């Protein structure tokens, strides 16, 4: 029933994708709602810090300025069927875009296999 080491095999022709979206923290609820509207039922959220062209910012604490190199962001991880990819990316783009530096990034990659630990389900049924 469950695959053993070395027995992993592709699911029955299902193409799975992974979206990693880095967005502004205050937009999390809006992005989450937009993804749910297009049929995404599960996601993993992680608080992350980083910088790109935005290059951090300056904060003042007790009269002293500090350079903050890493900017707080939220990483949203979603594994989904290839058929939902375009709608999910579009939902993130429309919801997370402010037009200013620091809007974030979206990374899309292929997923070889997905398995639900509890049941052993594979592929799209495991998501």
Predicted features along the sequence, with ranges:
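Positively charged, small/polar-rich N-terminal and surface patches that mediate targeting and assembly
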Residues: 1-127
């Amino acid at each position: 029933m469950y695959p053993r080491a070395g027995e992993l095999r592709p699911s029955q022709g299902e193409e799975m994708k992974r979206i990693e979206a880095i967005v502004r923290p205050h937009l999390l609820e809006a992005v989450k709602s937009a993804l749910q509207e297009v049929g995404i039922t599960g996601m993993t959220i992680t608080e992350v810090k980083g910088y790109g062209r935005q290059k951090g910012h300056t904060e003042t604490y007790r009269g002293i300025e500090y350079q903050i190199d890493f900017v707080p962001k939220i990483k949203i991880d979603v594994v989904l069927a290839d058929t939902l990819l375009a709608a999910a990316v579009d939902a993130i783009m429309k919801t997370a875009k402010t037009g200013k530096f620091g809007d974030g990034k979206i990374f899309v990659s292929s997923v070889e296999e997905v398995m639900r630990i509890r049941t052993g389900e594979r592929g799209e049924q495991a998501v």
